[in-house]
């Protein structure tokens, strides 16, 4: 494992793969290199028959602050084809992915978590959606996915105000799966081991069925948002 890379890949036990965002000096802000590495590691884990579950984690104080805004203003987008933002938003991964959110998950950081199958949050986890304050819209998943997880009224509240949402509030609205007593990473690894101990084909089938239902809810929003969001993005890039 090359610890100088901004995303790390390692094994936990025999059946769990762990992908760790490793750019703490930038609060794990997602750039193109990170998106490419996330895509590579997800494919590696999904194609490895010995891997039965995947954990996506950040650092103890930060999951991800979202898109790298400095890179964005230089014309770089952390989007790869066909997986989309962060190499994950539209990724077709058969195995269960668990997001371990310790610290902040802002903007695109929360979008990455929403693209996972389970979200485990630490006691101090915080979520926020600051894009409207920057003249942007969370187009890579949240505007489409969040209303399918919480009510449309709660989604609009969070998206329009950009206020900070703590782990307890996120859990109360069904935006996350559970709050850990220790670190989210530790709890996510425990859950991953539990899932990995089940029948792999059965777990993949359950995921596929649930994801298909969610996709039908989300598809119209994903299709509608492309034009308006692209116009906003171009306007923001010119500022």
Q: PLM features: residue spans?
A:
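Conserved CoA-thioester-binding segment of acyl-CoA-metabolizing enzymes
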Residues: 1-59
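Glycine- (often His-adjacent) and acidic-residue-rich active-site loop
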Residues: 6, 58-92, 133-135, 216-220
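Hydrophobic/aromatic residues within transmembrane alpha-helices
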Residues: 19, 56, 68, 112-114, ...
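C-terminal alpha-helix plus adjacent terminal tail
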Residues: 1-14, 63, 162-168, 179, ...
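Short, active-site-adjacent cap segments at secondary-structure transitions
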Residues: 61-65, 106, 128, 210-213
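An acidic, glycine-rich surface segment that forms the CoA-thioester-binding/catalytic face
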Residues: 35-37, 43, 47, 69-106, ...
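Crotonase-fold acyl-CoA enzyme core
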Residues: 91-203
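Hydrophobic alpha-helical segments typical of transmembrane helices
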Residues: 84-86, 142-145, 154, 205, ...
């Amino acid at each position: 494992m090359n610890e100088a890379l901004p995303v790390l890949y390692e094994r936990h036990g025999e059946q769990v793969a762990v992908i760790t965002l490793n750019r703490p000096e930038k609060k794990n802000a997602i750039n193109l290199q990170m998106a490419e590495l996330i895509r590579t590691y997800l494919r590696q884990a999904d194609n490895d028959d010995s891997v039965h579950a995947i954990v996506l984690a950040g650092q103890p104080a930060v999951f991800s602050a979202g898109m790298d805004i400095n890179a964005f203003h230089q014309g770089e987008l952390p989007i790869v084809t066909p997986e989309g933002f962060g190499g994950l938003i539209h990724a077709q991964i058969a195995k269960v992915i668990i997001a371990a959110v310790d610290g902040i998950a802002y903007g695109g950081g929360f979008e990455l978590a929403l693209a996972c199958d389970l979200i485990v949050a630490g006691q101090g986890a915080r979520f926020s959606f600051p894009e409207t304050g920057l003249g942007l819209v969370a187009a890579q998943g949240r505007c489409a996915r969040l209303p399918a997880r919480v009510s449309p009224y709660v989604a609009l509240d969070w998206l329009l105000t950009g206020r900070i949402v703590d782990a307890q509030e996120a859990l109360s609205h069904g935006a996350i799966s559970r709050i850990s007593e220790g670190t989210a990473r530790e709890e996510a690894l425990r859950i991953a081991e539990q899932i990995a101990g089940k029948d792999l084909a059965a777990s993949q089938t359950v995921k596929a069925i649930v994801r298909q239902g969610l996709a039908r809810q989300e598809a119209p929003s994903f299709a509608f948002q492309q034009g308006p969001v692209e116009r906003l993005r171009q306007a923001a890039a010119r500022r």
